[in-house]
Amino acid sequence: MKDIFYMKKAIKLAKKGSLTTSPNPNVGCIIVNNNIIVGSGWHKKTGMKHAEIYALKTSGEKAKGATAYITLEPCSHFGKTPPCCVALTKYGISRVVIATLDPNPKVSGNGVKWLKKHGILVTIGTLSKESIKINKGFFQRMTTGIPWIKLKLASSIDGRTALNNGKSKWITSDKARHDVQHVREKSDAIISSSETILFDNPLLTVRNTNNNDNNQKLLKHSKTFLKQPIRVIIDSKNRITPSHKCIKQPGLLFLIRIHSDNNIWPSHIKQIILNNKSKKIDLIDLVKMLAKYQINNILIEAGPSLSSSFLKLNIINELIIYIAPKILGNYAKPLFFLENYSNLSDVPQFKFEKITQIGKDLKLILTKHNSS
């Protein structure tokens, strides 16, 4: 019971870095000596000290003979920071409780081996599911080579996204649209389509988040400014031009194309060519490519065509649906364009994770049955 109690505190600490640690995972560490917390820390940002180092420095000499509760296996290799295993030994930690092993197959288990080799008792698996949950994207990218993929949608209660003439501003309330900004800021990349850019001309940036109390706490803990997600526009027909709003906004933007054009693009715009025999953008190739850029979490914001294409590939891990108390009717545009299924067993299936009322609207979060 003590291990669970202290690991919960370590996981709570880890969450403080949720807006700033990517591509690294969120990690927290609590150091306990004689049932007293003598040190604590969390990983704040890539390139900065790991959680264990902050906790050890705050504990000082009191770390000798203590137990360290860490939400992820401590590193044993030299990277941007020295290995945490060495520091744990140097400070005299006698026992380490680890929520879960590092999912990176190249290093998984190495930290545990190092600790045991140097005489430290190790316990593994305390609140493992909870630790994985706060790092879903990192774990998925490391184990499958594909980031965690979220699809954001907004609809009426009859599942319609726009009137037949295309008008959709605004189906949901200001509060719901404000909440979308918080969904964006927790994403490493936003995928959209040229169709969406041509029709709505959106910015696809994070904005208007400063009024959120929880966000302010996270920013205070991180001591840094939020970075914008990488914007990824699928533009197989080269229809996006330097005049579109999203292009004029600062922050890295990928134009995913079959071939490049001769436009003069700003330095933050990168044309990425994904060509194949079908002359279409392969969405699996796209998300695998984004994983190589160390992107853990992808948010899709697009119309029914692209949303349906991703859904058919069965790679959507999470649905985020904002539902407005409006009825648009059967002539309005649907959420998806899907085939005419003959059997219910063939349809895409998700499970409800959370339902929240935001202003006049509902926010539904659903995950696949096989998603963590």
UniProtKB/Swiss-Prot annotation:
PROSITE patterns: CYT_DCMP_DEAMINASES_1, CYT_DCMP_DEAMINASES_2. Residues 1-145 are annotated as: Deaminase. NCBIfam families: eubact_ribD, ribD_Cterm. It catalyses: 2,5-diamino-6-hydroxy-4-(5-phosphoribosylamino)-pyrimidine + H2O + H(+) = 5-amino-6-(5-phospho-D-ribosylamino)uracil + NH4(+); 5-amino-6-(5-phospho-D-ribitylamino)uracil + NADP(+) = 5-amino-6-(5-phospho-D-ribosylamino)uracil + NADPH + H(+). SUPFAM superfamilies: Cytidine deaminase-like (SSF53927), Dihydrofolate reductase-like (SSF53597). Keywords: Hydrolase, Metal-binding, Multifunctional enzyme, NADP, Oxidoreductase, Riboflavin biosynthesis, Zinc. It comes from Buchnera aphidicola subsp. Baizongia pistaciae (strain Bp). This is Riboflavin biosynthesis protein RibD. Converts 2,5-diamino-6-(ribosylamino)-4(3h)-pyrimidinone 5'-phosphate into 5-amino-6-(ribosylamino)-2,4(1h,3h)-pyrimidinedione 5'-phosphate. Zn(2+) binds at residues 50, 75, 84. The lineage of its organism: Bacteria, Pseudomonadati, Pseudomonadota, Gammaproteobacteria, Enterobacterales. NADP(+) binds at residues 154, 170, 196, 200, 236, 303-309.
